[in-house]
Every structure is written in structure tokens, then in C-alpha cells.
Amino acid sequence: DRGFLHCDLLIIGAGPAGLAAALTAGRAGSQVILADEDFTLDGRLNSEQLAFGDQSGADWAAQTVAELASLPNVRIMARTTVLGAFDHGIFGALERVSDHLPQPAPGKPRQVLWRIYTKGSLLCAGATERPIAFENNDRPGIMLAGAMRSYANRWAVTPAQRVAVFTNNDDGHQTAADLHAKGVAIAAVIDVRPDAPLSGDYEVIAGGQVINSRGRLGLKSIEVALPGGGKRQLSCGALGVAGGWNPNVHLTSHHRGRPEWLPQIAAFGPAAEGPKALRVAGAAKGDLSTAGALRGGADEAASWLRENGFRASRLELPEAEGAPISITPFWAVKGCNRAWLDQQNDVTVKDVKLAHQENFVSVEHLKRYTTLGMATDQGKTSNMGGLAIMAELTGKAIPEVGTTIFRPPYTATVIGAFG
């Protein structure tokens, strides 16, 4: 089915930033649409063990959603992906109405493609974790550390009884700490930083690197290069890989805006010249702290409200984790070839090296020669690694190499929805 909606402010994403923004705008009396692709409205708050004052982050999110649901001027759209930003403040959004039901209700469509007309919009789409490339990193049991943490905290599931974590930033240590607290054995945290923090009652190999994996039908062990030389085998059934977080800036590029480099998080942030009246807050803007996301979402919403004739009061926010993430950029283990960057299109480090050898060094040529980032995810986890490796091969800084931009739809969409 298809439909049309109008609002003052469209808020895209219902994590900490989106919820704070929606609460600010909703209390001010503006017509608000809050859209999120998940079936719960909390972003990563259900995936983390975060304290919001004297309550958990997940409880704060549930309390906030309950208040928003009680406001007649706020429309909450779960299971709704805002898939494109178009001219004149128009957005396309796909609502999955009955895909999740074993038996759809009579008269209900499978999906609805909404055309949303807005006066303003706020992108609070969060960030996507990226991997680190190493030899044979496609073996079952190797996954992103944030996903491993989500399984544990949100679903009470662990991929193995003994896990290891490979990281270049503090966030990887949080995965180990959360799993350890739930009784999962931690083989080790392998941190490429020589000054890696000691985060718990388990081994931390500072300055180490995972250089290979082994196992016939799944991961059985990893090979670790030690900082002082030599190698070591670690037995584990799963490996969480934490290479940093990329802001989900896709909608800011739908009017040809080009993402800009943010050295503090070693990732590309939102384009300065994005769609008209589209603001960005939270992790999508490069602020990876929870406190920063909360305040950023509330402040961006309040700023828009004041500019458009609404009276916005300052939102009282709970105390939350506010430390900036510490990261050392590390994209791929030296000397690896059979190391996957884009697992959907089977693009390896070797393919990027071959593209450089054949002089396909422009990011647009690299993309088309290797198909890096041309799968249905548009390179959400893979692009940064490939671009960083090409930058190293050409002797340039990553901002000089640049990045490709994104086009609608944000995620793969059923063709029939456009009919």
C-alpha cells in the first residue's frame, strides 16, 4: 500500500538522541513523527548495560516511549525505515505492517510506502560498527563485537562458551566485560594498542594482533602475534571484532553531499551540504558518548523549534556515560591477503591491492573494479577498511582519498513497494 503523511519535525532513529529530540519536540506541541527501523524504540540501549541515573538505559527508553505514545501530536512508527531524502523536505519511508506476523490480519497490507512531507528533519540514525581485516576472518563464529554484546544483553544468548575479542578501541573491552559478567569465559582481549586498558578479571594482550583463525565447521582457535615477537594459539568458539564505529550518514548524501572526515573517531561524518533543513545528532554526527547523544538530540530539536516559532524548554536529562571513545585507527593486519573487507560481495584486501596495481586508485574506480560497497548494504561495514587500505597504498591520508556517497534506498527494499 501507499500513503501520505505531514509533520512539523521528522525524527529518524529512536536511540538516545532520537528519543530526547522527540520528547523535546513533543512537549513543545509540534507535530512529530518518530520513525525507527527496529520493533523496539531504544537504539542500542537494550544492547548495553548503561545506567541512566538510578535506572537502566532500557528502562529510561521504555518510560520515554510511553510518554511519547500518550502525546496526541506525536506519531510513533516502529518497523519503519526512512529510505530516502528527496526534494522539498519529502522523505520516503517503508513501514513493515505485517511481515512479522505469522498470519496477517484481514485487510492489512504487507508493507506501506509512506511519502512524508516535513518542515524539518533530524537524523539520529546512530552508527554501524566496522571490522578489522585479518587472514581467514570469514570463518563462522567471527562477528562484530557490538553484535556479540547485543546477543548477550538483549537476548541472553552467547555465540560460544569461550570467546575472545580483537579490538583497537575501548568499546571492544565493553563487550568482554559484559559477557564476563554473564558467566562467559573470556579467552583474551587482543588490543592493538600498546597502552590498552586492563578492563576485567581476564587476560588483555596489549599490542597484539589476531593474524589467523582455524576451525573446519566453525571457529576453534585464533593465532595471535605477540608484541614482543612470537605467536600464540588461543582456543575459542567465537571472536568479537571491534574496529570502531561509522556514523550512519547515508541520508545526508542523498542530495549529493559528501561525508567529511572526523579524526577523533577515525570515520566519515555527515556532509556539511546535506538535504535542506536536515539536522544531525548523536552517533550519526560522530558523538559516540551516550550523554552527548542525549544532549545533542535535545539541543538540535530545541534549536529547530525556536527557529520555527515554537517555545521549547530545556529537557532535563538523566546522568549517563559521557566519556569519548578512545581509538587507534587500525584497518587490517599487515601481510594479510585472504582477509575479507566486504563479505557480501567477497571483496578481500588482496582485491584492493590488485586495484591499486592496475591503477584503479580513485574511490569510484576502486568501488567498480572490486565491487566494494556495491552490495545491498552499500558498504556499511566494509567501505572504511577498503578506503583506508587504498590510502596506505597510495601514500595519502584518508581524507585525501575520500569516499563514495550513498543513494536511496538506505536498505534493500521490496520492488513491489514502489509499484
Regions found by a protein language model. Give the residues of each.
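Residues forming the flavin
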Residues: 1-419
